[in-house]
């Protein structure tokens, strides 16, 4: 199985980089993990709705260019489905049963995701109604991916 994270924006904080690196190292025994960071578009302080839409579209097109036809795409969006960790673990494992060997997770930038990215996604997923920095969301997501594998292994990590 190959897992790809397509994210908008450069990760700057060392503590987040260190946490993500640790979980990526742990995941190596289960799957190949690839992190793709796309440059975010500069957003003016008082951007108009039209400017925001144009920025979303540019970022969305960059994201779509990194998604292959045969990947199962899970886009993180506030309106998406919420899952307990056990259900998320089962969902990840079920994708292989349905003929997908690659799962791509998408995390948008500060403006969210362009509608075409949401449309391309096989699943919209949410970690709740809270607003989190998209950089922090990377760490939360990769930990949950690791937890999903630990649940499948019957590991006490999940307790």
From Swiss-Prot:
Which protein family is named in the record?
Belongs to the RNA methyltransferase RlmH family.
Oligomer status and interactors: Homodimer.
Name of the protein in question: Ribosomal RNA large subunit methyltransferase H
Its Gene Ontology cellular component terms are: cytoplasm
Q: Which PANTHER family match?
A: METHYLTRANSFERASE, RIBOSOMAL RNA LARGE SUBUNIT METHYLTRANSFERASE H
Chief location of this protein? cytoplasm
Record: residues binding S-adenosyl-L-methionine: 76, 108, 127-132
Presence of the UniProt keyword Metal-binding in the record: no
Protein EC: 2.1.1.177
Purpose: Specifically methylates the pseudouridine at position 1915 (m3Psi1915) in 23S rRNA.
Do you know which InterPro entries this protein is assigned to?
Alpha/beta_knot_MTases, RlmH-like, tRNA_m1G_MTases_N
Q: Where in the cell is it found?
A: Cytoplasm
GO MF terms here are: rRNA (pseudouridine-N3-)-methyltransferase activity
User: Catalyses which reaction?
Assistant: pseudouridine(1915) in 23S rRNA + S-adenosyl-L-methionine = N(3)-methylpseudouridine(1915) in 23S rRNA + S-adenosyl-L-homocysteine + H(+)
NCBIfam families in the record:
PRK00103.1-3, tRNA_RlmH_YbeA
- What is the protein's species of origin? Streptococcus sanguinis (strain SK36)
> Would I find rRNA processing among this entry's keywords?
yes
Sorted alphabetically, the keyword list is: Cytoplasm, Methyltransferase, rRNA processing, S-adenosyl-L-methionine, Transferase
Q: Which Pfam families match?
A: SPOUT_MTase (PF02590)
